[in-house]
Structure formats: structure tokens, C-alpha cells
A protein has these predicted regions:
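Pocket-lining segment of extracytoplasmic ligand-binding domains
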Residues: 86-87, 165-169, 175-257
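Hydrophobic/proline-rich hinge and linker segments of small-molecule sensing/allosteric domains
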Residues: 100-119, 210-221, 225
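Alpha-to-beta junction loops
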Residues: 57-58, 74-83, 95-98, 126-129, ...
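Immediate post-signal peptide segment of exported/extracytoplasmic ligand-binding proteins
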Residues: 20-31, 53-56, 116-127, 226, ...
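Secondary-structure end/capping motifs
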Residues: 225-301
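Conserved C-terminal helix/tail region of periplasmic/extracytoplasmic solute-binding proteins
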Residues: 295-329
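Bilobed "Venus flytrap"/periplasmic-binding protein-like clamshell domains
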Residues: 25-49, 62, 110, 120-190, ...
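Bacterial N-terminal signal peptides
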Residues: 7-16
């Protein structure tokens, strides 16, 4: 009888051990992001500070180009991406398996102008530099900022200007004004450009109770369904990085410096002030507004709703930074 019980016990232990090992998910997560600026800093911080390793997640990470990040997520090559919200919404409406799961920095951009520009009215008929068309920043400009100051997109000549060239384009008169993301707006101001609209005034909050959020973390639903534990840990590592940026700015600035050694440290610190870190989720009013603007511009293949393009369920239970210590693996 003892031998029988011992055999049963040994078999049960073997079954439990195999089951436990089978429960461990060793899938290598494919993650893509743009360049290591404030909008996409979270995965670079997670890699540099070892957040993913502390959560026990193996990540194949590439970064460096936001256009490539958008493209790779649009064709399903990667599980997780740091993308423009407008792109994520547009891809979702086109049937791509992308959903917004978290937010990044807020505002983090300036409107700058040639010193000869005295008022917004002076911009009528002039060239106005933008990063690209139909992203969240472009739509904020044409649907929110220009109308607030008595202009429309037809009143200015919108021109694509590479953000690193903003200062020279402004000061040489190639464009009268521009709307670059940070730190290039602050750099232009340092070089003599006029600050026409500060970061915290991107949105008139008397009429729209939100900030401008351009980028965030996006996941494929298929990945979330097939690897829920890994998806949650990737999400929490992102949330940890946002909390570091909010609570410990010097640590966040050090990460920016590490990946951008040629950028003046004072510029990095100055531009940090123009980026908000209050959001782990993009507000419903903001996503609804982006969808409304995109419908007006005719760039959605079908109607979509906030609930269809967002899923914040992975954020549930987040214990705060550092998540890996408070929850364990």
C-alpha cells in the first residue's frame, strides 16, 4: 500500500512539474518603436534598465524609425509597437489587428515661428512646417489650433519639414512657422525662433478637456489572446517607464541622454518640461475626437468606436513602480 501511495504521489508531482513548466510562456515578444525621444522612450528605458528581464520576458526589440514602426504593426510583423494613435485607429478601421493599450507623453510639441511673425494673422498665405499629414499632431493643428486663432488649413501652405531641420527652416525663412515635436521646438527657440504656442496650450481645455496625446503602445489582439501573461508584463514594464518619467525625471532624462549623446543636456532638460506624464490611458474624449476628425478628413475605411480601438484590460492590477518587485514574476 505504501508503494502504491508513493507511486501515486510521485506521479502527481511529475504531472504538477510538467504542468508548471508548460504554463511558463517562453515566446519571444517582437516589439518595435521609433527613435528614443520622449514619445517612444518607454521601450528604450525597459531595455536599458532591464525591466523586461526583471519581469522574465524575452523581447526582440528594434527601434529607430517611427514610420517603420507604424508599417510593421500595420502588416502584423510585430506583436507590440509604439505608434501614432491616429495610425493605430486608421489601421484598426482597415481591419488590421491593432489596439491601443496605453499612453505615452502628452503634448510634447511647440509651435514656433520666424521672429518677424507678430501674430497668427501674419501666417496667412505663408508656408507652415509640419512633420507629416494625418497624424494626431497634424489633425490637432488643422482642427483645433488654426481655427482657434482665426485660420484654416487653406489659409496656410502646409509643408513637410524634417524635424531636425526646423530651426534652420524657420530662421532662413523657408517656412514662417512650424509645429515640431520636442526637443526640436525648444532647440529652434534656443537658436532664435519665436515661441508662438507653448506645449500646455495645444488644446483649449475650456472646450476639449484633454491634452494632445500623439503616441502610445499598441498590441495585436492575437498576441494578447495567445500570450496574456507576457502581454501583461510588457504592459506593466511600459507603465513602470511612464512612472519613472513622471516621478523620477532625472532618471528618465539620463535614458534620453544615453541614447542621444550628441543632444545638449540642457536642451533635454528644457524639453522635458513640455511633456506631460499624467496619462497611462488615452482619455476617451481624446480618442473620440481623433475619430471625429479622421471621419471629417475622410481617412477611415469604416466607422470605429473608442471601445473598438482601445483595450486597457492589461493595466488592471498594476501595483505601481516597480511592478516586478510588488507583484513578482
Amino acid at each position: 500500500m505504501k508503494k502504491l501511495l508513493a507511486g501515486v504521489f510521485a506521479g502527481a508531482m511529475l504531472f504538477w512539474s510538467v504542468g508548471a513548466n508548460a504554463a511558463e510562456d517562453h515566446y519571444k515578444v517582437k516589439l518595435v518603436a521609433g527613435s528614443p525621444g520622449y514619445d517612444h522612450i518607454e521601450p528604450f528605458m525597459a531595455e536599458l534598465k532591464g525591466f523586461w528581464k526583471k519581469y522574465g520576458v524575452d523581447v526582440d526589440f528594434i527601434g529607430g524609425n517611427y514610420i517603420r514602426s507604424n508599417q510593421m504593426m500595420s502588416v502584423g510583423d510585430y506583436d507590440v509597437g509604439y505608434n501614432q494613435f491616429a495610425s493605430a485607429i486608421r489601421y484598426n478601421a482597415a481591419g488590421v489587428d491593432n489596439v491601443i493599450v496605453g499612453a505615452s507623453s502628452a503634448n510634447c510639441a511647440l509651435v514656433v515661428a520666424n521672429p518677424a511673425i507678430k501674430s497668427w494673422a501674419d501666417l496667412k498665405g505663408k508656408r507652415f512646417g509640419i512633420v507629416t499629414k494625418f497624424d494626431a499632431q497634424y489633425m490637432t493643428l488643422v482642427h483645433e489650433i488654426l481655427p482657434r486663432f482665426g485660420l484654416s488649413a487653406k489659409d496656410v501652405n502646409l509643408a513637410l519639414v524634417p524635424v531636425p531641420e526646423t530651426a534652420s527652416a524657420i530662421l532662413t525663412g523657408d517656412v514662417a512657422a512650424a509645429f515640431p515635436f520636442e526637443p526640436y521646438g525648444s532647440f529652434a527657440v534656443q537658436k532664435g525662433a519665436k515661441l508662438l504656442l507653448p506645449a500646455n496650450d495645444m488644446i483649449d481645455k475650456k472646450h476639449l478637456d484633454t491634452d494632445m496625446l500623439r503616441n502610445g503602445i499598441v498590441m495585436r489582439r492575437k498576441f494578447m489572446q495567445e500570450h496574456p501573461d507576457l502581454a501583461r508584463k510588457i504592459m506593466w514594464a511600459h507603465m513602470d517607464a511612464v512612472e519613472v518619467m513622471r516621478q523620477h525625471p532625472d532618471e528618465g532624462i539620463d535614458v534620453i541622454k544615453h541614447f542621444n549623446p550628441k543632444i545638449d543636456e540642457s536642451l533635454i532638460k528644457e524639453s522635458y518640461k513640455n511633456c506631460g506624464w499624467e496619462y497611462q490611458k488615452a482619455p476617451k474624449v481624446w480618442i473620440d475626437t481623433l475619430i471625429k476628425w479622421m471621419k471629417q478628413d475622410g481617412i477611415l475605411q469604416k466607422d470605429v468606436t473608442y471601445d473598438q480601438v482601445t483595450d486597457y484590460s492589461l493595466q488592471e492590477g498594476y501595483p505601481g513602480y516597480p511592478g516586478w518587485e510588488k507583484h513578482g514574476k
